[in-house]
């Protein structure tokens, strides 16, 4: 490890790597908060779409009352 002692205090110097150089810009905005709502609305839309997707999958799995008129069987998919 690259540790150097100066005046009874140790200082560690990190090693530069190509992965670190690539990831450095992602960490440069740490602690900063954009003003306003930012992408909160977009995130809400995606959460709502995901909830609809989960409800559809659950209804197909349970053959729910909402799907009474729709045949849900693998044999109906055959030509």
Curated annotation (Swiss-Prot):
It is a single-pass membrane protein. Signal peptide: none annotated. It holds the Pfam family PsbH. GO terms for cellular component: chloroplast thylakoid membrane; photosystem II. The chain crosses the membrane at residues 41-61. The modification Phosphothreonine is found at residues 3, 5. GO terms for biological process: photosynthesis; protein stabilization. It is found in: Plastid, Chloroplast thylakoid membrane. Phosphorylation is a light-dependent reaction catalyzed by a membrane-bound kinase; phosphorylation occurs on Thr residue(s) in the N-terminus of the protein. GO terms for molecular function: phosphate ion binding. Keywords: Chloroplast, Membrane, Phosphoprotein, Photosynthesis, Photosystem II, Plastid, Thylakoid, Transmembrane, Transmembrane helix. One of the components of the core complex of photosystem II (PSII), required for its stability and/or assembly. PSII is a light-driven water:plastoquinone oxidoreductase that uses light energy to abstract electrons from H(2)O, generating O(2) and a proton gradient subsequently used for ATP formation. It consists of a core antenna complex that captures photons, and an electron transfer chain that converts photonic excitation into a charge separation. Belongs to the PsbH family. PSII is composed of 1 copy each of membrane proteins PsbA, PsbB, PsbC, PsbD, PsbE, PsbF, PsbH, PsbI, PsbJ, PsbK, PsbL, PsbM, PsbT, PsbX, PsbY, PsbZ, Psb30/Ycf12, at least 3 peripheral proteins of the oxygen-evolving complex and a large number of cofactors. It forms dimeric complexes. This is Photosystem II reaction center protein H. The gene is psbH.
């Amino acid at each position: 490890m690259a540790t150097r002692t100066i005046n009874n205090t140790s200082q560690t110097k990190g090693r530069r790597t190509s992965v670190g150089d690539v990831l450095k810009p992602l960490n440069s905005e740490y602690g900063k908060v954009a003003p306003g709502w930012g992408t909160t609305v977009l995130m809400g839309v995606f959460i709502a779409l995901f909830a609809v997707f989960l409800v559809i999958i659950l209804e197909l799995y349970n053959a729910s009352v909402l799907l009474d008129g729709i045949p849900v069987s693998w044999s109906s998919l055959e030509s």
